[in-house]
Amino acid sequence: MLPGRLCLVPLLLALGVGSGGGSGDGGDSRRRRLLAAKVNKHKPWIETSYHGVITENNDTVILDPTIVALDKDAPVPFAGEICAFKIHGQELPFEAVVLNKTSGEGRLRAKSPIDCELQKEYTFIIQAYDCGAGPQEAAWKKSHKAVVHIQVKDVNEFAPTFKEPAYKAIVTEGKIYDSILQVEAIDEDCSPQYSQICNYEIVTTDVPFAIDRNGNIRNTEKLSYDKQRQYEILVTAYDCGQKPAAQDTLVQVDVKPVCKPGWQDWTKRIEYQPGSGSMPLFPGIHLETCDGAVSSLQVTAELQTNYIGKGCDRETYSEKSLQKLCGASSGIIDLLPSPSAATNWTAGLLVDSSEMIFKFDGRQGAKIPDGIVPKNLTDQFTITMWMKHGPSPGVRAEKETILCNSDKTEMNRHHYALYVHNCRLVFLLRKDFDQADTFRPAEFHWKLDQICDKEWHYYVINVEFPVVTLYMDGATYEPYLVTNDWPIHPSHIAMQLTVGACWQGGEVAKPRFAQFFHGSLASLTIRPGKMESQKVISCLQACKEGLDINSLESLGRGIKYHFNPSQSILVMEGDDIGNINQALQKVSYINSRQFPTAGVRRLRLSSKVQCFGEDVCISIPDVDAYIMVLQAIEPQITLQGTERFWRPAAQFESARGVTLFPDIKIISTFAKTEASGDLRATGTAPKSAVLEEMLHNLDFCDILVLGGDLDPRQECLELNHSELHQRHLDATNSTAGYSIYGVGSMSRYEQVLHHLRYRNWHPTSLETRRFQIKCSELNGRYTSNEFNLEVSVLHEVRVSDTEHVNHLIVQPPFLQSVYHPETRSSIQRSSVVPSIATVVIIISVCMLVFVVAMGVYRVRIAHQHFIQETEAAKEAEMDWDDSALTITVNPMEKHEGPGHGEDETEGEEEEEAEEGMSSSSSGSDDSEEEEEEGMGRVRHGQSGTSSQRPERSTWNTAGVINIWK
């Protein structure tokens, strides 16, 4: 049938054309429609629905099923072909294209890359169109409408981001939380796979926190406010494609303390700069009571310094200097001095040299030499000491002797002793029969906890027999037990005074020490015939550091306070917490030493609370802090002055002698670092040290004699005692030197040193003496340089004619005495620089040699030449006789003016010259008379005479030359 129909098409077309040839265009179109209707009988056919997938950022759509349109008019040209696929919808990003008109195959594609985040899926209508009856798109037939559903496939292009840049939470210490807070992140991808957050993670390590997949953060252990008050952790997030967050978020967790009663806002370490005065310790402290019903409060601040020196920071001057500083009476005897040549009995003891603390280990004792302490202490005397002692070893401990005066041999009697027995301090004093013959008090016992507390305490025993009083740390204690005894029978046995043990001279095969002391002692002294006052005792044991209160008048009402004697403990009481807080903020630390001991001072604050009608009251923990005393600036003490000078021998022999240090200066400096330089050029400030002068005290200056001790038979060092006393200093003198001691300013020591003199009764055998000065502050803690002085003696030397080997240097007898007048200032300069005198002497001798050489040829010419020389130098007159000639060359001696007797001398010289030239046989008598007459006017030595005078003037001369070295 189909081939038959195709055969009819040309026929029908021919008929249509023939029949309608004359009716116009309307007839033609009607005929074409009729023809098409007969040829394009069927509509294209497609599936009713399509499902497709397109990948994000791509244009290819994968459809299921594929687009294929069928037309039953095929294979008729145009009518059986598919010409187009059309999509119905507004602004759809897709288009459908025909791949093959005959087969009807098509393809759906995107006009531009698809963004899933804008739209995840699309639904639209599509229809297929055949080609109709011809190429003019006439009579196209379209298929039914098919539904196309396209889903956009997502790409994981976005990373998770947190909703908040930072999170903050507050937790209470001591609790475990299921969730402290929740962090949340989002992802802008469109698919569930890439847009959902599948995991959270804590980036910060070693923190007591964990996080779950939902972002909930919890703590894994109990948090402590005291251990750490804030935590900062970083958290990241992952989407289900395991892409991490672009930026981590910060989570800050603050730990809030559980309300605990106690002191708040105080600093554990407190630094103290030396010289800063009184420094507040708790400027911001306050008490947290947690709403407790507190009725009253007692606060105790304790400065713990028992491990420093002798219990606290005290002046480290020598015991003699401290006694002098505190105004103690003279006559103190130091039983534990620093080891030296004069005090060698402490050389074998264990000692802490920095503080002069002697340690006794139960095996040591020291014998005090005879004569150090008088045998009769009288009824009044004082014993002082620093002692540190612990519990006695053993159940029945034996006596531990501190000081003992016992028989040296034969017997074992104790005349007086101070010892510790079972933590009791006992003082024994046995009178002799010649002092008393009745039953008298002999042993005095004190029972104090401080004796065995292993801490330093200052003990003073004042004896005014029969009353004995103990002062410990400034407080007075009466003996709890006094036992009586008979006086000691008189004997001629010598006594032995010991420290650290008692000497057992009798009742044993060999005398030995016994009853050894275990502990530490310092500043053990005894003062016979005098009791010490309470003021001096307080001064000697006073601490230079302690607690203080700034502005006592500003303390709140109802505040009571109390200091212990050393100001190391302060107790404050009150019923108002606010007033207590203000009062405690005014508590300060002060150290009055210019050079305090550096180191730690522990500080404890304890509290006692009473509450209103409460069975259980709050408990306030102690505050443990410490004060760090920084190192003080160390001074550099420098001695300056003349290091060498010369003095005439007569001055050494005079009553006042020679002043050794007339211009000495004592200067103390310290190095101060300052920033300098060009900051713009270097970027940093270089530091330079600048010396600045500082003022402080000295405690001794030693003047040592170098090159051998002084010979007391012919030399000594002298110093007026008034110079010392008016400056509150003392001194000791020996053949080894002079020692000035006492706490005083550097200017006081300068003034005293300016008056120190050296005398020598026989300086003829002395050429030089050398001395050395060395000064100290704080008992040798800071010492000066060693200043050396050399003193030389200017001697008068006599030279006779027999000592001249070369007779050309002997002055001829016709030369008169020559003077070299100089002023006093020249003499003073020459005393310092003796080389000037030597130069003048050499020049004078050369002149004389020249004159003698000329005189050999012609006496007249020599005489005239000498006159010219003497006129030029304004010298003295000459004599022509053969008698002895005196020549004095002393450029350092003060002479009369150059014009004295000048005219008269010149006239006489001319007359004598004429007489000598006219007749050589005029006799020696006249010449001798003239010479004696001239020498009577100018004479500095003794002249001798010649028994015979040769024709050509043979000279025999005896001369004296005074030379100051």
Curated annotation (Swiss-Prot):
It is a single-pass type I membrane protein. The keyword Iron does not apply. The keyword ATP-binding does not apply. Residues 857-965 are cytoplasmic. Residues 942-959 have a biased composition (Polar residues). PROSITE patterns: CADHERIN_2. It comes from the Eukaryota. Keywords: Calcium, Cell adhesion, Cell membrane, Cell projection, Endoplasmic reticulum, Glycoprotein, Golgi apparatus, Membrane, Postsynaptic cell membrane, Repeat, Signal, Synapse, Transmembrane, Transmembrane helix. Residues 1-20 form the signal peptide. Proteolytically processed under normal cellular conditions. A primary zeta-cleavage generates a large extracellular (soluble) N-terminal domain (sAlc) and a short C-terminal transmembrane fragment (CTF1). A secondary cleavage catalyzed by gamma-secretase within the transmembrane domain releases the beta-Alc-gamma chain in the extracellular milieu and produces an intracellular fragment (AlcICD). This processing is strongly suppressed in the tripartite complex formed with APBA2 and APP, which seems to prevent the association with PSEN1. It is found in: Postsynaptic cell membrane; Endoplasmic reticulum membrane; Golgi apparatus membrane; Cell projection, Dendrite. Residues 21-835 are extracellular. Residues 891-965 are annotated as: Disordered. GO terms for biological process: associative learning; chemical synaptic transmission; homophilic cell adhesion via plasma membrane adhesion molecules; inhibitory synapse assembly; positive regulation of synapse assembly; positive regulation of synaptic transmission. Residues 892-902 have a biased composition (Basic and acidic residues). InterPro entries: Cadherin-like_dom, Cadherin-like_sf, CLSTN_C, ConA-like_dom_sf. Postsynaptic adhesion molecule that binds to presynaptic neurexins to mediate synapse formation, and which is involved in learning and memory. Promotes synapse development by acting as a cell adhesion molecule at the postsynaptic membrane, which associates with neurexin-alpha at the presynaptic membrane. PANTHER family: CALSYNTENIN, CALSYNTENIN-2. Binds synaptic Ca(2+) with its cytoplasmic domain. Belongs to the calsyntenin family. This is Calsyntenin-2. It comes from Rattus norvegicus. The lineage of its organism: Eukaryota, Metazoa, Chordata, Craniata, Vertebrata.
